[in-house]
């Protein structure tokens, strides 16, 4: 019979590390060494009562097995708990980093990062399963799947796209609005721009939606990280380029030079010049041309909007008062815009300065010329001074009359008093002569 050593270092080390097989074998060997007799097993003899050492050894063996089972279960629970904690912490870190990267990517490269991640997820989902398939499914649940919604979201979040849209609208309004204003102001006799040319011009403009290769390029859409002031504005078009664009859009219309005359403006715009009034005097100047000369691209005044709808005596009298004739008022600007040689204000001032009984007597007369502001001030000052002097002289005359009346009454009172006293003195003289 061979026996093993009592203390085996390998068995002890295996027991420490949680291996139950070696420890159980060592315990069985130790118990077999303590048993008397030649038998190697633990079973007692059938005819004899098992000794107390065997019972105690079996009890210790049961206790050791139970403790080892508890230790193994505890270690397994701890390992599972640590693995779950590590897994949850790793998932939280991955989710946090993923969310941080996603938010940073939205600000820096929204179109590229989101389109790439969506395409990568769509490519990996139909393929063979891999260990990171669950994480990819979580990523796809966070990201939008509809490409239309993705493009709409990118367009609202990216400031570069907003600036591109504003530049497109500016260029569109700058190139199309002059043609629209010209087509609205042309008369029925003039030929207008066809709808096909307008469609070609609108298609020739910068497209509002760029191609997909431009949308996915990060260098074309996003500014560099060092650029904090934003992209530089696009250089504005020169006057020659704008004239060429306008001529390309409207081939029938002529490009006007800045030094175009009023006749060219009137011929191009189709607005007839206001003819001079037939009843106006010969020396009356024509209406001011400033009311009909307007710059390129500005709206023109329509004299029919300011004319009277119904002819009446009041308007005819006002026209004759201001213009010196019996015609109606052609435009509001004819009344508001006056020159130095016009006679409208002069007629009114002549009516005020004349001594006629009725203003109707002055309607057929020309009246004086329009005087300067200095002459008006001088006349007003002379009128004021004359009024003040007239008022002062009237006051002085009234005071003089009052003083004269007071003096006259005083002198009359003094005379009556002297006569009364003279009468008494005569009576006293008579009584004295009679008493003597």
From Swiss-Prot:
Keywords: Cytoplasm, Phosphoprotein
Phosphoserine sites (modified residues): 375
GO CC, one annotated term: cytoplasm
Compositionally skewed regions (Acidic residues) per UniProt: 1-10, 45-54
Composition skew (Polar residues), residue ranges: 81-103, 167-195
Chief site of localization: cytoplasm
Keyword Ribonucleoprotein: no
Entry annotated with the keyword Cytoplasm: yes
Record's subcellular location: Cytoplasm
UniProt feature, compositional bias: Pro residues: 273-289
Source domain of life: Eukaryota
One Pfam family of this chain: DUF4678
Region ranges (Disordered): 1-142, 165-307
Record field: compositional bias (Basic and acidic residues): 234-247
PANTHER family noted in UniProt: TESTIS-EXPRESSED PROTEIN 44 (PTHR37365:SF1)
Protein known as: Testis-expressed protein 44
Organism: Rattus norvegicus
């Amino acid at each position: 019979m061979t026996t093993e050593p009592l203390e085996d270092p390998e068995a002890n080390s295996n027991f420490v590390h949680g291996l139950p097989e070696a420890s159980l074998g060592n315990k069985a060997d130790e118990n077999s060494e303590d048993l008397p007799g030649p038998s190697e097993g633990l079973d007692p003899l059938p005819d004899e009562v098992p000794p107390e050492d065997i019972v105690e050894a079996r009890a210790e063996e049961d206790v050791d097995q139970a403790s080892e089972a508890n230790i193994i279960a505890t270690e397994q629970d701890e390992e599972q708990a640590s693995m779950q904690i590590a897994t949850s912490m790793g998932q939280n870190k991955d989710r946090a980093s993923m969310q941080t990267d996603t938010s940073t990517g939205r600000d820096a490269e929204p179109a590229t990062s989101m389109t790439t991640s969506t395409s990568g997820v769509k490519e990996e989902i139909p393929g063979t399963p891999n260990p990171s398939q669950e994480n990819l499914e979580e990523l796809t649940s966070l990201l939008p799947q509809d490409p239309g919604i993705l493009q709409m979201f990118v367009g609202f979040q990216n400031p570069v796209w907003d600036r591109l849209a504003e530049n497109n609208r500016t260029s569109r309004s700058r190139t199309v609005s002059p043609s629209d204003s010209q087509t609205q102001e042309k008369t029925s006799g003039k030929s207008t721009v066809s709808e096909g040319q307008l469609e070609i011009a609108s298609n020739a403009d910068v497209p509002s939606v760029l191609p997909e290769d431009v949308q996915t390029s990060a260098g074309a859409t996003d500014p560099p990280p060092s650029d904090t002031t934003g992209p530089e504005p696009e250089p504005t078009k020169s006057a020659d380029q704008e004239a060429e664009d306008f001529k390309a859009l409207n081939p029938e219309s002529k490009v006007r030079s800045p030094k175009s005359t009023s006749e060219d403006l009137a011929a191009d715009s189709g607005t007839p010049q206001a003819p001079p009034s037939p009843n106006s005097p010969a020396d009356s100047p024509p209406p001011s041309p400033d009311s009909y000369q307007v710059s390129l691209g500005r709206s023109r005044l329509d004299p029919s909007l300011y004319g009277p709808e119904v002819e009446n005596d009041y308007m005819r009298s006002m026209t004759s008062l201001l213009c010196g004739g019996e015609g109606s008022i052609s435009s509001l600007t004819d009344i508001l815009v006056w020159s130095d040689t016009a006679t409208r204000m002069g007629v009114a001032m002549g009516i005020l300065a004349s001594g006629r009984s009725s203003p109707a007597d002055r309607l057929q007369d020309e009246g004086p010329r329009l005087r300067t502001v200095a002459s008006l001030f001088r006349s007003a000052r002379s009128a004021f001074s004359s009024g003040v002097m007239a008022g002062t002289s009237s006051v002085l005359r009234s005071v003089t009359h009052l003083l004269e009346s007071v003096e006259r009454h005083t002198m009359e009172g003094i005379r009556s008093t002297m006569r009364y006293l003279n009468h008494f003195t005569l009576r006293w003289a008579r009584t004295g002569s009679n008493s003597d």
